Amino acid sequence: MIRRAPFLILLRFCRMGKMACSGYPPFQGRIVLSEMPAHRLAALIRSKEVSALEVAESFIDNIEASDSRICAFLYTDFSYTRDVARRVDEELKSATKLSPLAGVPIAVKDMILTRDMPTTAGSKILEGWIPPYNATVIERISRARMPILGKTNQDEFGMGSSTEYSAYKTTRNPWDLSRTAGGSGGGSSAAVSASQAPLALGTDTGGSIRLPAHCTGTVGIRPTYGSVSRYGVIALASSFDQVGPCSSNILDAALLHEVIAGYDPADAVSIKDQDLNFSQAAYEGANRGISGVRLGFVNPSNWCNSKITDLFGRTLKSLESEGAVLHEVQFPNFDHAVQAYYLIMQAEASSNLSRYDSIRFGPQEMAASASGTVSKTRSIRFGPEVKRRILLGTHILSAGYYDDFYMSAQKIRSLVKRDFAKIFSLVDVLLLPTAPTPAFKLGEKIDHHTSMYKSDTATTPASLAGLPAGSIPMGVIDGLPVGLQIIAPGQFDSRVYSTGAAIEQIIGDIHAMKNTKHNTGQTA
């Protein structure tokens, strides 16, 4: 196959119809396919200015060139990627009506079941396991004709905030290879940040989409709990788990969210009636701006470092100068949220992970008896962090401690929901820094578990309440990106997109501010 390496195309203009609204103007001049946002790639494919196969090859080239350094992927199947891309090109020739993201490649977190591709949840206990069916979200992106590039790295079973607890490799931050890409889903966000994929799927339990977005300068959205099917998603903590989009910008996340959202009878908590006009909300927000929007905020100075606190303050002033209405709100139980989350999450995880007995699926470590085989397999193939949380969760649920720990945490959860209800009676959305610090050095917190858990301070409240929340780039501190979190009322995901798109226009593209290491080739 002849490739137009590195897939440079000279374009005078792109006829992009709706995509060329004032908030999202078309590219002009010399472009690189792998550096284009998904909505523009989709428009080029539909207009036949480039083929879906050309787009796929550009990202395959990037993965092959950079993933030995980034370590975003655990598994790739480029033959499958190319087959789906060719199918899109053939269907375009026959004038078949396709989805808005047809032909746009996507990466998938390894927590999500993919038929005919390994799914390990980043754990040796599922090493080599190939599921017999697809998750609902995979069926939906398959129907949308989105070529899957591969499965992305993660902390084992989603337990971690740095992707250092993966049993296979440590994902590195494309902005600085010595730093974390966040977790648990650092692989998905790193792939988007490094232009290895225009879109990715992640899962968010307590911040596993939003924290990596913060660390890598990308967009990560946690949808309303129950709005995206969990069927076929490996369970960590069932009352928190949610699938969501990772992208380079708000509009792309909205388009992917529309593909994966919707009622699914296979998920007991799936919401039947949903407003799925997320891309329209993004268009309107980009065009209308932030004027008149009531933005709530909480003073982060007692849990954020001073540089992020200062940047957050400057961002609020900038938004106010554009017409936003600011309200400092009271959040009485904010400081208790992360503690309550970890108590409930570990209790649920200890129950969910009891199914991994090496008999039904996964490799076995043989012993003299069946019970011995189960015990030996779990002892050898679960990583230290997973075993730690299983033990803690079992302790939390044990007689004599259940009321003191688990039920007390559930009471805090109810209070957090009550706090949010009061906040949203006053404001349209709540703004917070996504995390207390920029991406930390790899190895810095791996043995300091409490410090690692505190990375989730700002992301766990929305998880406890089941609310939609997203992290978008807020700026750069010492050469590292930091995120701004937008939280909206339940089933008002469109507010995350409209507000995020408006703020995105004001803040601008932070990637031009990447540090010197990036520009001298020491990062991807």
Swiss-Prot record:
Catalytic machinery residues: 109, 184, 208
KW ATP-binding (keyword) present: yes
GO biological process, one term: translation
PROSITE patterns named in the record: AMIDASES
One cellular component term from this protein's GO annotations in UniProt: glutamyl-tRNA(Gln) amidotransferase complex
Catalytic reaction(s) noted: L-glutamyl-tRNA(Gln) + L-glutamine + ATP + H2O = L-glutaminyl-tRNA(Gln) + L-glutamate + ADP + phosphate + H(+)
InterPro entries for the chain: Amidase, Amidase_CS, Amidase_dom, AS_sf, GatA
Enzyme Commission number: 6.3.5.7
Statement: the UniProt record of this protein carries the keyword Cell wall biogenesis/degradation: no
Entry keyword set: ATP-binding, Ligase, Nucleotide-binding, Protein biosynthesis
GO molecular function terms listed in the Swiss-Prot or TrEMBL record: ATP binding; glutaminyl-tRNA synthase (glutamine-hydrolyzing) activity
Subunit structure, interactors included: Heterotrimer of A, B and C subunits.
Function: Allows the formation of correctly charged Gln-tRNA(Gln) through the transamidation of misacylated Glu-tRNA(Gln) in organisms which lack glutaminyl-tRNA synthetase. The reaction takes place in the presence of glutamine and ATP through an activated gamma-phospho-Glu-tRNA(Gln).
Family, as annotated: Belongs to the amidase family. GatA subfamily.
UniProt-recorded name of the protein: Glutamyl-tRNA(Gln) amidotransferase subunit A
Organism (species): Tropheryma whipplei (strain TW08/27)
